[in-house]
């Protein structure tokens, strides 16, 4: 009997044996496993100041620059500080009046993104400035859609991504973020929705972590209405 015939014979024998083979039952019930997963994530405070503090802590771990500001004037001033520090020469922004106003004091070239904007032009700017749909305190993530980010490319192609958020957009966790999407867009959801958790990270086979290989190397989140409510000195800065 050839090796092939031997293998086929063993398969036929196994099939003739029939009968369902049950895997041993796990001692952990599904609800126990869910509880175990939840223990991995930090507990989210119920109050706004506690959630800002948690977002700041997660940002520090993720190497996100988090800048809480008292109002739009302070946010505009922070943008100028970041621009001067990073030596921005140009920025790209969506067609958004609030973002236009915040950037009005910057003495840099401004590219307002439209459907006709070339991707190569976005790759050349110093920073891409977008809004967002939500900030997630528990994970330090930013929720974006094509609508809030001015399309798909503005949050991906520039080397530095800057997110402008308001205090009303800070939510506790991922389920709350999905509720935001449901209430804001259902049933006509945007074609692009994403969670951004820190700058772009790529790990190779040798476990070498590289920032910015497949997306922005730097991520800055400016929270308007969040000053004085985060941990420490009120900011989480990663230069």
Q: Where are these predicted regions, by residue range?
A:
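The feature marks the mature, well-folded catalytic cores of soluble enzymes
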Residues: 1-239
């Amino acid at each position: 009997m050839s090796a092939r015939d031997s293998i086929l014979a063993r398969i036929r024998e196994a099939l003739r044996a029939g009968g369902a083979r049950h895997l041993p039952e796990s001692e952990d019930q599904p609800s126990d496993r869910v509880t175990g997963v939840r223990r991995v994530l930090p507990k989210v405070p119920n109050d706004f100041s506690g959630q800002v503090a948690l977002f700041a802590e997660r940002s520090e771990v993720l190497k996100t620059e988090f800048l809480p500001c008292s109002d739009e004037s302070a946010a505009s001033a922070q943008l100028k500080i970041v621009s001067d520090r990073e030596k921005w020469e140009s920025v790209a922004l969506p067609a958004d009046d609030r973002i236009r106003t915040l950037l009005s004091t910057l003495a840099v070239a401004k590219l307002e993104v439209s459907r006709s904007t070339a991707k190569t032009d976005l790759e050349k700017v110093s920073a891409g400035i977008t809004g967002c749909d939500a900030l997630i305190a528990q994970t330090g993530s930013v929720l974006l859609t094509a609508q809030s980010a001015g399309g798909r490319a503005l949050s991906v192609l520039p080397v530095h991504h800057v997110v402008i958020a308001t205090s009303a957009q800070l939510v506790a966790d991922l389920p709350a973020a999905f509720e935001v999407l449901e209430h804001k867009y259902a049933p006509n959801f945007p074609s692009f929705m994403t969670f951004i958790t820190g700058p772009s990270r790529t790990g190779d086979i040798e476990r070498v972590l590289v920032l910015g290989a497949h997306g922005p190397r730097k991520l800055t989140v400016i929270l308007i209405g969040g000053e004085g409510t985060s941990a420490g000195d009120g900011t989480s800065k990663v230069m």
